A protein has these predicted regions:
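Extracellular glycan-recognition/adhesion modules and their associated mucin-like linkers
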Residues: 1, 9-43, 55-72, 528-555, ...
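N-terminal catalytic cores of secreted or lumenal carbohydrate-active enzymes
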Residues: 75, 81-250, 284
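Structural recognition of the beta-strand scaffold that forms the well-ordered cores
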Residues: 88-96, 126-133, 137, 193-197, ...
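Active-site neighborhood of glycoside hydrolase catalytic domains
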Residues: 229-236, 240-248, 258-363
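Aromatic/acidic polysaccharide-binding cleft in carbohydrate-active enzymes
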Residues: 352-425, 438-442
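Carbohydrate-binding surface patches
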Residues: 439-479, 515
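C-terminal beta-strand-rich structural cap/linker in extracellular carbohydrate-active enzymes
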Residues: 501-529
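C-terminal outer-membrane/trafficking sorting elements
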Residues: 683-743
Length: 743
């Protein structure tokens, strides 16, 4: 719903509630639909909508009592946990469709340079590539308008098929340009991984006689009598590349966004609708033909446009009995919530199914659009947990958003655009073989190298000047500040080496200018995953939202709230009476205020509370479900586990107990991560900015020294140590007491 007018104030569409977001910023929720106000762009004049999920910086707001009030500097404080490994990452990549079919016609020198930029460890460092097997339109255009794709994705989308009619010989000389790029990639990057994928079967196998889809975009276009011939067509192309060039595709994907109604006759690109049942039938035909080919290639599927459809497709394949014939699951993330992402990750992990984010891109304007896609990348890596992340286009002519280089196919001119450097902030430094580890802030991405001696932190800021206060106390060893390297991309910088950070003990403070992305490389002594321990405090985080934490209110209510690392969010697992000697529980979960989690299943209630008095329902088991996630279940009623009410994940959502059953195929709102606060741990900077004015604000702080912008300039200072600070006014916090000091 777009808000262009003021509606009747008596309607729910005109009623809003305010929720704390980050620091001094809030979310504004519409009562009418339960969604948040936000924009689609950072540009001046952008329209405001009330259909946002509240997860993006463009959904955050600041209230000033003055028309010209200064927006406060925000400090985001959080901990990085090297022991909580999320996934082993294989690397980055891009589709070859359609840019390679154009750039492959260029001079050898220019091809060499753009492929070097693409594959070099000092370039984009990409190693996964998707080769498009063209279907090929009717050369006589009997059922379609000549060059109809020129009105959509451009003539570049016209793919050459290897046959002109059923029974024709293969014309292996076709698609020379895309092939030339692919072989150059292999030359430059011997460890490159290739996937073959199809957007459509050849025109002569279709109902419409047109390779862009059926006359009705919601109906299948491949005739069932051609299933076997199309399967042979795909496998024969794969086998040709193995026999002729020694290049074996790791995977073969026969579908592309096929349950949508995007693909229609005379459309803008090759495309082919397949109902779920049709896909199941085709997989049953394709698998034995591929197995008989002698190739090691496996089938991947099913490359749907959004993650919610990927979840539905996965279930359809399982129900259709063909999931075991699939060796890799692919999804695009053009849309989908983080809840969809964790559903997909959980399903794949349960079946040990490799998972790729195989295509995405985004529009927008300037660096704002580039950073918006970077946030989507962060969401994918943090919640979907793919092994590989794939860009859609490398080169474009008409824009600088859907690509990393821009130029003219005809003139053979090209240049790197800002998006190239934004992507490098991740792809150049997080290499294949790295592990993605846990950081409790959605504007951060953390990774460890295989030797566990280097931490990569990528920090994102889509808004105004921000500081990240990163607690590194969970690492066994930390560097001197001079050993840390940092690189930043902003509207005026492109992977520039910067020194806008400080390290005080285990507290890393990083300055992020307006609309910027920063990568830090830190030599560290990493740790390995361990079992749950007694006498260690944990922050208990819901899988659906890594910025929230299990929280007990003074009145005993248990909810998830913004993670402030407060005493009411710090839980210990204490062995209950009669617990097993092997440390498997049950446990009493008690926070630093002495409140114990208490369920009420015996009375038939789903209620969960935190109380200081004893109860017979204060014992829980913590069972690993999908590491690093766990099920926390009642000891007396083992099938009942901690649950996010109505599967919500926003601040204030009540936590209850609900049945965790085997037939619930995506119970991710009943899964929790236990984040151990070993060593220093503790509060990590400003917990909340309660006042809405820049001139008068209150803050709950960790012990330390803060400037008036809210930045922690000195952590945990002792009463006797001397510290050099610039002249100015500071707030000193010690044991909850704040004092203003002028220097």
């Amino acid at each position: 719903m777009e808000h262009d007018v003021v509606t009747d104030s008596a309607t729910d569409d005109a009623r809003f509630s305010f929720e704390q977001a980050q620091g001094a910023y809030i979310r504004i929720r519409c009562k009418g639909n339960g969604q948040y106000l936000g924009t689609d762009s950072n540009d001046s004049g952008s329209k405001v909508f009330s259909d946002k999920n509240g997860s993006d910086m463009k959904h955050f707001w600041f209230f000033s009592e003055k028309v010209d009030g200064t927006i406060p500097v925000d400090t985001l404080s959080y901990v990085v946990f090297p022991s909580l490994v999320r996934q082993k990452f294989e690397g980055w990549g891009v589709s070859l469709c359609w840019w390679a079919g154009q750039c492959g016609k260029w001079t050898d020198k220019k091809i060499d340079e753009i492929v070097t930029w693409l594959t070099s460890p000092t370039g984009l460092n990409y190693k996964h590539f998707r080769y498009n097997i063209g279907g090929g339109d009717d050369p006589e255009n009997k059922n379609c308008t000549p060059h109809h794709m020129g009105n959509g994705k451009g003539l570049r989308a016209e793919m050459e098929g290897f046959k002109d009619f059923s029974g024709d010989d293969y014309h292996w000389d076709r698609d020379e340009a895309q092939r030339k790029i692919m072989l150059k990639i292999r030359e430059k990057r011997p460890d490159a991984v290739f996937e073959a994928f199809s957007n459509s079967c050849p025109y002569y196998m279709t109902y419409s006689g047109c390779v862009s889809g059926n006359a009705d975009g919601g109906k299948d276009n491949l005739k069932p009598e051609y299933y076997e011939e199309f399967a042979h067509y795909l496998v024969d192309v794969c086998k040709h590349y193995k026999d002729e060039y020694g290049l074996e595709f790791k995977t073969l994907e026969p579908f592309n966004e096929s349950v949508t109604n995007f693909w229609f006759a005379n459309g803008p690109q090759e495309g082919c609708h397949f109902d779920y049942d049709s896909q199941v039938k085709f997989i049953k035909v394709l698998k034995p033909i591929l197995d008989a080919s002698g190739l090691s290639t496996i089938i991947s599927a099913f490359d749907e446009t959004n993650v919610g459809l990927a979840v539905n497709g996965y279930k359809a394949y399982k129900q259709g009995g063909v999931l075991s014939k699939i060796g890799q699951w692919n999804t695009h993330t053009y849309s989908g919530s983080n809840a969809d992402r964790v559903h997909m990750a959980f399903l794949a992990h349960q079946d040990k199914m490799p998972l790729w984010m195989s295509e995405v891109g985004a529009g927008g304007n300037g660096i704002g659009g580039n950073l918006s896609l970077a946030q989507k990348l962060f969401d994918d890596m943090r919640y979907l947990q793919p092994e590989t992340w794939i860009d859609w286009q490398y080169m474009e002519e008409a824009n600088d958003q859907w690509c990393t280089i821009r130029g003219s196919f005809k003139d053979q001119s090209y240049a790197r655009v800002k998006n190239f450097y934004v992507r490098q902030q991740c792809s150049r430094f997080i290499d294949g073989g790295y592990s993605i580890v846990t950081s409790l802030n959605d504007q951060s991405l953390a990774a460890m190298n295989e030797a566990q001696d280097t931490l990569v932190l990528v920090l994102l800021n889509e808004g105004s000047l921000t500081y990240h206060c990163v607690d590194l106390s969970q690492f066994a060893g930390l560097p001197n500040v001079g050993e840390i390297k940092a690189y930043r991309t902003s509207s005026t910088e492109s992977l520039k080496s910067v020194k806008d950070f400080t390290l005080d003990g285990s507290s890393l403070m990083v300055k992020l200018p307006t609309q910027s992305i920063t990568t830090l490389l830190l030599p560290v002594d990493g740790t390995t995953a361990v079992e749950q321990e007694e006498d260690v405090e944990y922050i208990i985080v819901p899988r659906h939202n890594l910025t929230m934490a299990l929280t007990a209110a003074a009145n005993g209510a248990v909810t998830i709230e913004n993670n402030t690392y407060g005493d009411n969010q710090r839980w210990k697992l204490k062995a209950a009476d009669g617990s097993s000697a092997d440390g498997a529980g049950p446990f009493v979960l008690e926070n630093a205020l002495g409140q114990r989690l208490t369920s009420f299943r015996a009375s038939g209630s789903s209620k969960l509370s935190a109380q200081t008095s004893s109860s017979s329902e204060q014992q829980f088991y913590v069972d690993a479900i999908d590491l690093p996630y766990n099920k926390i279940s009642s000891a007396r009623y083992r099938s009942y586990a901690l649950d996010l009410s109505n599967a919500n994940s926003n601040a204030g959502t009540a936590v209850c107990t609900w049945q965790y059953t085997a037939d619930t195929d995506t119970p991710t709102h009943r899964q929790w991560m236990l984040c151990p606060l070993r060593g220093q741990g503790g509060d990590t900077g400003i917990e909340q900015l309660a006042d809405k004015s820049q001139d008068a604000r209150t803050a709950a702080c960790a012990d330390g020294v803060y400037d008036l912008a809210g930045r922690c300039v000195l952590r945990g200072a002792s009463e006797t140590a001397l510290h050099q600070l610039p002249r100015g006014i500071y707030v000193v916090c010690k044991n909850g007491v704040r004092r203003v000091v002028k220097k």
